[in-house]
Amino acid sequence: MSLLVRPATEVKRAPAIPAADHSRDLKSVVKVLEDAPPIDREYLAPREEFEERARRVNAALQRAGHAAGFVFSDEHYRGDVPYLGGNTNLSIEQVAGVIGKNGFHIAAGLEGGYVAERLAGRAGAVVHKVEILQLADEKYPIKAEHLEQVIEAAAGGPIDHIALLTPRQVIPAGIVRFLESLFGPDGVVDAQELYYRVKYEKSEIEMRLISDAAVIADCMMQSMLAVLRPGRLETEVAAWGAWAGRMLGSEADGFKIMVGANEANRTLIGPALNRPIREGDWVHLGVAPQRDGLTACVRRSVVAVDNPSRATEEQRFWMDLVEQGYQVGEEAYRKVAAEGLPARFQEQTLVDYFAGRAAEVSARVGKRVDLASLKPYTGTHNSGYTECQEFFGAITLDSQEPLGHRIVTMLDVALRGIGDRWNDVIIPGFDYCVVENTLGKDGTTVKCLTRLPVHAQELVGAC
């Protein structure tokens, strides 16, 4: 017998989902879609938007004494090339780009180049096929160009150095070494912050697309909550969110859909897996749909019960604590925006909130708990063509500058019940709870772009 074939008696089959359950779920999700605000699914950022971005980046480069800047993207770090090249349809192969006085030039392998050419024309970007960016060890019958030719084409001639606009943590070391072979180690200059600052400030068109993505995020989350019940797999719940997102016009996601039940809450950001959701489980859910590459996000924690009253008093306590923390964080963000305060005020307010609840929590669990240290991460971060990988704009206790003028911010308030390791249980029976929304700021005005209720428990199985 082949080692690849098992006898039928050894095959463990998952229980079939009754057709009636599928029909009920479909009816629930279709109702969510029918009630969704209208979105123009075919709307894309126009050429003028990309030309203005290129102008702003070139102006920043020139002020810093650089003739050309280098950017890089792949399926995971998707933003830096599409921001200038319009190629939001990244697929499999990595791509790079060079911005200079002659505009934006994309460098890609054969297949990645075809993919880029599908959309790059709308940005006025020129696509070049180069071997250094082709897929792994495959060979392609193309007349490839050299990367140095692409650089000269963008810069308008030979240059003596190039500015790295993408973080070195993202660009493959081999590409950095190749650039150093062209310009020397001192000729590859870190200039990432100037690009960060350009991308940080959003245009009205970007805010429109992010607002559309926020509508989709709400509907995806509402769909998943509607079908969430004990006995479902995490992936089954996530599947309905994915379907709703694509039906409403999201072509990609800032991260894989999150559905984590029971111990999976300890991942904080883990994706849905083929794991059953049990009666009374904590479940964290998260979505980050993109419209024309621009991202919105919403995350919530709920309990898998068929009636909100069946959540335990203990579960309601932790949920209330985090939800109140979110309200404190949003109020502080609005104050920072309205008064032009240093952004750190908002993060300090969150830290102080959790520290102020520490004695209460310590008494509840019967031991001293440093609650502020269980706030797992910075509560507020920048977003755009990635959900949380902008490398700039997160609000920390070191953020002395005020907020930008027109920006998008993810307000992510959470609490964990574990320490530095998976089994380092600090609060028994509680692993993680989160509330995250997408905020838009324009001048002193702040709007929560995602409209799902902060307390989402009543939406579980609600449709």
Tell what function each PLM region has.
Residues M1-C463:
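Active-site neighborhoods and metal-handling regions in enzymes and metal-associated proteins
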